[in-house]
Amino acid sequence: MTLISPPAAVQLRPQALSEKIALSQARQPAAAPAGPKTLIVYDNPPNSEFSKLGMVFGIMLKNLMGHFDSNADLLPVQDYVAGTMQAYDATFYLGSYYGNPLPPAFLSDVSTSRKTVVWFKHNLSQLAWNPVYEFPARSGFKFSGMRGMNAAPTAANPEPGFFDTIGYKGKSFVKHYVFNTATGIINADPDIGVITVLDKARATVIVPVSNPRTGETVPYITRSGNFWYVADMPFSFTGPRDRYLVLCDLLHDMLGVHHAESHQAMVRLEDVGAKVSVQAMKTLTDYLHGKKIPFSIAVIPRYEDPLGVFNNGMAQTIPLSEATHLKTALNYALPRGGEIVMHGYTHQYSNLRNPHTGVSGHDYEFWNIVANSPVAEDSTAWALGRLNAGLAELASNGYTPVAWETPHYHASALASKAVAQVFDTTYQRVVYFTADKPDFKPAPNKDFAMGQIFPYVINKDYYGQRILPESLGNIQYDIGIIDSTSNAMNTWQDIVTNAAYAKTVRDGFASFFFHPFLLEPAARAPGYQDFQSMIDGITALGYTWVAPSQIP
């Protein structure tokens, strides 16, 4: 999977092979962000299995602040000191843990501050129900309490319903919900805080949320002067049609940063390695070039099949210098609007099945997905070695990437930090961790990891990366007959629908990737026809097609 690339001015700094390509050298320090100064306060209850859940949500919000050139500070709520928020333009409180006791100093400052305060989900009762703070009179609305499922789901009634449908800009954003009747486990976040507006001169409902089963509608996002209330935690169970996009858009208003309406689209040809079909690449290149659509190519510099899965049991390595098909495809595509994104070094790990075949393009490179842990060698230095090796392989064959994309969008924290030292721009989704060496075993204070999609450019994320968004996903077919790992379905219509939702973000991108092997006869799929339909559908929505290097 791949993302977008940087403008020429922020591409990799040129280094000579004779200097051994000192690509691990850190970039020059950037100027301090010019955006609003923001504070993110999160729940961090002691000795709970969910102690660090608030932190991972805080990291996700901090990443979004990177779109606004704001290098947000993170603070556990128990460490809050009176007067702290007055040094910030905006304070966000993430109420992820029900009943977490909040410091009186924090509650008092929220009550009296004239700076922007945005409160998410839980624990508003500690402010709204304490007469000392005169909350209803000050805010113009009252807090009634929390609501969850309409009833407990059962095998006979697996979908009893909840407040799951957020209405915004003519779209219905439906929250994720899956109930496993065998285990009784609910995969959802149904709880919301219910408020009632008492004084419309003081409080305004910005976004409603409805409960289709009961017919009720209540406020989802409410504003009272400098105070905003978001009824749930929009960082849980996110997706390309989720209420997370509503928050991403409204952050402009919450922060007072008014980006112009702008909608750009990007397409990336994915997992292009030594055994790519030259004909498939030429077909896609000619189509995009004919449409005057720039594109990027996620290139795997070195091919490895250590177990001989596709070579009659004999291990096979193909360096780029010997990858005739790949170089032919690249040399045809680059003069016709293509740009290279470096997609890992080998896009696989060691001689292990991680988890599929051990073959380049199939497996994870910077994460042990089988053990769900960092790889044994994990360190910034180890990751830098692989990044440098991949760049050297490209450079020695005359190629320069405009961005980086992590294989399967999943790398360790230390590997992501290494990427930020080498590449000025990445084009991807990212997994974030609450520790560099996370421990996920069920226990008090266990670590959390969370993947994040971005609808727009993030100038600096938690690991220091600049990120161009891949926000729509990709066409998928059930091709298990030729690849046992590929049996999901995601149609071109799904991608175009995702693009329609992405337009609700005022500067949201429509960015997706496509596997050229879907044009090969063995795939037994209408890949090329569907690719054209997808391009036409996104174009019809009014997006402007751009190359990664054109994004400022």
Name each model feature, range by range.
Residues 264-274, 278, 381-384, 388-403, ...:
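Catalytic grooves of carbohydrate-active enzymes
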Residues 13-88, 261, 288-290, 297:
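Aromatic-Pro/Gly-enriched surface loop or interdomain linker
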Residues 48-127, 279-282, 307:
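Helical hinge/lid and interdomain linker segments adjacent to catalytic or ligand-binding clefts
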Residues 97-179:
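A glycine-rich, often tryptophan-bearing local segment used as a flexible ligand/cofactor-contacting loop or short
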Residues 71-74, 251-261, 279, 283-305, ...:
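C-terminal domain-boundary segment and adjacent tail
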Residues 39, 124-131, 294-412, 509-518, ...:
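Metal-dependent polysaccharide deacetylase catalytic core of the NodB/CE4 family, i.e.
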Residues 184, 374-457:
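Catalytic domains of cell-wall/extracellular-matrix polysaccharide-remodeling enzymes
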Residues 155-225:
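Catalytic beta-strand/loop cores that center a nucleophilic Ser/Cys/Thr
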